[in-house]
From Swiss-Prot:
Family as reported in the entry's similarity comment: Belongs to the urease gamma subunit family.
Name listed for the protein in its UniProt record: Urease subunit gamma
Gene3D superfamilies with a match to the protein in the record: Urease, gamma-like subunit (3.30.280.10)
Pathway(s) annotated for this protein in UniProt: Nitrogen metabolism; urea degradation; CO(2) and NH(3) from urea (urease route): step 1/1
Pfam families the record matches: Urease_gamma
Alphabetical UniProt keywords: Cytoplasm, Hydrolase
InterPro entries: Urease_gamma, Urease_gamma/gamma-beta_su, Urease_gamma_sf, Urease_subunit
Source organism of this protein record: Dechloromonas aromatica (strain RCB)
């Protein structure tokens, strides 16, 4: 199977997001890469499902709370930018203050 660099990046994000999801389900607090991966993965999946950029910008702030992440992690992530593939093309989704 031949994958482009972009496809490899998407698979890596999905894998990291899945790991973060499993750790969160176990009750573990997420670290920086896990938190970013979980939010990024959710945005990418939402885009694939046909949600709008505005819907995803809002949804990105509802995924994690400060209680879900290790101390200080929320302050390390002032925004997350995701280049996601929508049914009508690729768009940049920016989520400001994703962890509330």
């Amino acid at each position: 199977m031949e994958l482009t660099p972009r496809e490899k990046d998407k698979l890596l994000i999905f894998t990291a997001g899945l790991l973060a999801e499993r750790r969160q389900a176990k009750g573990l607090k997420l670290n920086y890469p896990e938190a970013v991966a979980l939010i990024t993965c959710a945005i990418m999946e939402g885009a694939r499902e046909g949600k709008t950029v505005a819907e995803l910008m809002h949804a990105g702030t509802q995924i994690l709370t400060r209680a879900d992440v290790m101390d200080g992690i929320a302050e390390l992530i002032p925004e997350i930018q995701v280049e996601a593939t929508f049914p009508d093309g690729t768009k940049l989704v920016t989520v400001h203050n994703p962890i509330v």
